[in-house]
Regions:
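Single conserved hydrophobic/aromatic residue that forms the stacking wall/gate
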Residues: 1-12
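Conserved phosphate-binding/catalytic loops in two-lobed NTP-binding clefts
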Residues: 165, 182-207
């Protein structure tokens, strides 16, 4: 889908799509953005100011949502992403072979509901869910998610021939994801950017940055309040 943004309602997504540009002056459009958060999981071709093409997105749970639900299965606090990552450090990412839905699909869409269910079935079969087992489950789950995201980014780069990739959204704070996607630089001849940790989650600095950019453009700011606003309806 080709989207030309027209209103103030897109500030939330634009702040994440453009967040690395606050810190990396050399980053220029066009580029590929992997936007992963609690409410959104999509790969976007950022063509120019206000013009984006959604190349693929989750067909069910967002990545951050899946992290939170798996964290709940493991009796971890909310929000679960940080706690899953901490547990995974001491776990074996190959301990459990969780499903990786749509990893080999011809398109760039993703699915994390099946992966979440795979974890649930595993947890239900375990009588003693001790810390070591929790760490292995967390590491295996995190590895499965990142495998899917890395594979989709590789396909997006090949499809668009873009030389720059940015990772944005709350899940972009995950160090394992950062490391694995950063590894694509040498293997695929691309440059990978991600914002500082403080800019991964919603913050006023990013909104102000995007607002300053939008102030030089013509926007119709009439919009209705909605909890979630699909990018292709902005």
């Amino acid at each position: 889908d080709l989207i030309v943004s027209r209103g103030l309602g897109d500030v939330y997504k634009r702040q994440h799509l453009m967040s690395p540009m606050m810190e990396f002056s050399e980053l220029q459009m066009p580029f590929i953005c992997l936007l992963v958060s609690g409410g959104h999981s999509m790969i976007v071709d950022v063509k120019e100011k206000g013009e984006y093409e959604i190349l693929g997105q989750s067909q069910d749970d967002a990545v951050g949502e899946a992290f939170d639900k798996v964290a709940k299965m493991l009796d971890l606090p909310y929000p679960g992403g940080t706690y899953i990552e901490k547990l995974a450090v001491s776990g074996d990412p190959k301990a459990y072979d969780f499903s990786r839905p749509m990893i080999n699909s011809n398109n760039l869409d993703m699915s994390f509901s099946g992966l979440k269910t795979s974890v649930l079935y595993t947890v239900q079969k375990i009588d003693d869910l001790n810390d070591n087992i929790k760490s292995d489950i967390a590491a295996s789950f995190q590895s499965a998610v990142v495998d899917v995201l890395v594979e989709k980014i590789k396909k997006a780069v090949k499809l668009t021939n873009r030389s720059s990739v940015i990772i944005a959204g709350g899940v972009a704070a995950n160090n394992f994801l950062r490391k694995e996607i950063k590894n694509l630089e040498d293997k695929n001849g691309i440059s990978v950017y991600y914002p500082s940790m403080k800019y991964c989650t919603d913050n006023a600095a990013m909104i102000a940055f995007v607002g300053s950019k939008m102030s030089h453009e013509k926007y119709d700011i009439k919009s209705n309040a909605r909890a979630r606003w699909p990018l292709n309806e902005l």
